[in-house]
Amino acid sequence: MINYKNLNELENFKILEGIAPEVLKTALTGKRIKEYDITIEGDSVHYNYASKQINENHLKIFQNLSDEANLIEKYKEVLNGEKINISENRKVLHHLTRGQIGKDVIEDNKENMREFFQSELEKIYNFAKQVHSGNIKSVNGKKFKNVVQIGIGGSSLGPKALYSSIKNYAKKHNLALMNGYFISNIDPDESEEVLNSINLDETLFIIVSKSGNTLETTANMQFLINKLKSNGIKEYKKQMTIITLKNSMLALEETGCLEYFFMHDSIGGRFSPTSAVGLALLTLCFTEKIVKEIIKGANKTDKKSLNKKVKDNAPLLAALISIYERNVLNYSSNCIIAYSKAMENFYLHLQQLEMESNGKSVNRFNETINYKTVRIIWGGVGTDVQHSFFQMLHQGTDIVPMDFIGFNATQLKEDVISDNSSSNDKLKANLIAQIIAFSKGKENSNKNKNFKGERPSALIYSKELTPYAIGAILSHYENKVMFEGFLLNINSFDQEGVQLGKILANQILKNNAFEDEVIESYSKKILKQD
């Protein structure tokens, strides 16, 4: 029988609390680097944990802890359609957007959910072909060259991360057919800037809102409608597509749009990049060939994540290491650095994925817990960050574990040789140097020049940042977050913390009398500017 116990009630966690971290200065060897390396999806995308502060003793306890907490069994419950999201009484079905792994999942005793997601994807493929061929044109008969996605949170961050990761790869392979843009913030300057930078006559718009009444998305959609009308595009709906729930206000009220692609309430926004939320824009911009590779990489990782052996399951191992670092070593943040400009938006998606999922203070049964949960997730792009916050990481008083991401080859295949090495070789050399410097440090009698080392890191790497690779990496982090939530005994699939601010904002906008003196005082400072 599957048990749902708090982390501090698990016997093997109590054992783990007494285990000191490995000393990287002496432990990090060529042999260790070779041995502490596994593939994320069973093929070409690797997770190397040689520079983590763990050894074989930790790995043994990790295995026992995973078994005791029934982590793989809980993952199987997700795949088989159990209502894991207990606070909202919902299933968690994002894995089904990339393939059938568990049992058939039937919703409301009639609809096969894998077939539902696949049928929506086929609709996207067919729609994109019609757009690319010119059979579907703009109101003024122009062929669409641009796609603008309007949405916020999971309706923007994940899709934007995938778009920027793949854009140059698609260009190099002559698969970049349309330009993608995103509008998320309710700040009208963002909408104005994006819409003024493109030819509206050649632009298709995707409106994404699961509920259909997201404040920011509704406001930005109205901004768009006003802009289109003022530019002579009166039949604006002929340039709009909608992604939402079947019975949402958006689906019911905004009739007559070009096409409707449907989400399902079993998939939260942060887990939705491989649903219509992310794949509609990606298919339009880069063709279904690219999208199928993303799905393939994610699906293979999903399958390999079923492996009970911790040393062969990268997301599971990464989750256990994360719990050890947060709850035993007391490291409060995790920095994600991709040595690839194309992945500049990826850590922003991971911020939401991890912090919205596991930033909780009650367990699955709505009981307050007395141990740490999620770490602060932040990051950037190497080598830029070496000249900004790496000083703090090397010599600051806080130890911050890092995830490095790197690739052997570039996407565009253009480079230059200077000082006997290419720019890409310099990029990779800096990545390697940082891992070693953080691990081993460098002793100096001058304390200002002394580097203590013992800064742990993991390395995710592959030959090239391909659609397949980004799909595998995306799934790796999604499953890692899921396993962390299981260990912490929390519900990783709701987000009540988002709601309070929304409620207060609506009260402020509607309450002209300002009966609350705190609201009144702030409103006079910011809204009224008295």
UniProtKB/Swiss-Prot annotation:
<dbReference type="Pfam" id="PF00342">
    <property type="entry name" value="PGI"/>
</dbReference>
<keyword id="KW-0312">Gluconeogenesis</keyword>
<comment type="function">
    <text>Catalyzes the reversible isomerization of glucose-6-phosphate to fructose-6-phosphate.</text>
</comment>
<feature type="active site">
    <location>
        <position position="387"/>
    </location>
</feature>
<feature type="active site" description="Proton donor">
    <location>
        <position position="356"/>
    </location>
</feature>
<dbReference type="InterPro" id="IPR001672">
    <property type="entry name" value="G6P_Isomerase"/>
</dbReference>
<dbReference type="InterPro" id="IPR035482">
    <property type="entry name" value="SIS_PGI_2"/>
</dbReference>
<dbReference type="InterPro" id="IPR018189">
    <property type="entry name" value="Phosphoglucose_isomerase_CS"/>
</dbReference>
<keyword id="KW-0963">Cytoplasm</keyword>
<dbReference type="InterPro" id="IPR046348">
    <property type="entry name" value="SIS_dom_sf"/>
</dbReference>
<keyword id="KW-0413">Isomerase</keyword>
<protein>
    <recommendedName>
        <fullName>Glucose-6-phosphate isomerase</fullName>
        <ecNumber>5.3.1.9</ecNumber>
    </recommendedName>
</protein>
<comment type="similarity">
    <text>Belongs to the GPI family.</text>
</comment>
<dbReference type="GO" id="GO:0006094">
    <property type="term" value="P:gluconeogenesis"/>
</dbReference>
<dbReference type="GO" id="GO:0004347">
    <property type="term" value="F:glucose-6-phosphate isomerase activity"/>
</dbReference>
<comment type="pathway">
    <text>Carbohydrate biosynthesis; gluconeogenesis.</text>
</comment>
<dbReference type="GO" id="GO:0048029">
    <property type="term" value="F:monosaccharide binding"/>
</dbReference>
<dbReference type="GO" id="GO:0005829">
    <property type="term" value="C:cytosol"/>
</dbReference>
<dbReference type="GO" id="GO:0006096">
    <property type="term" value="P:glycolytic process"/>
</dbReference>
<comment type="pathway">
    <text>Carbohydrate degradation; glycolysis; D-glyceraldehyde 3-phosphate and glycerone phosphate from D-glucose: step 2/4.</text>
</comment>
<keyword id="KW-0324">Glycolysis</keyword>
<dbReference type="GO" id="GO:0097367">
    <property type="term" value="F:carbohydrate derivative binding"/>
</dbReference>
<dbReference type="GO" id="GO:0051156">
    <property type="term" value="P:glucose 6-phosphate metabolic process"/>
</dbReference>
<dbReference type="InterPro" id="IPR035476">
    <property type="entry name" value="SIS_PGI_1"/>
</dbReference>
<feature type="active site">
    <location>
        <position position="502"/>
    </location>
</feature>
<dbReference type="InterPro" id="IPR023096">
    <property type="entry name" value="G6P_Isomerase_C"/>
</dbReference>
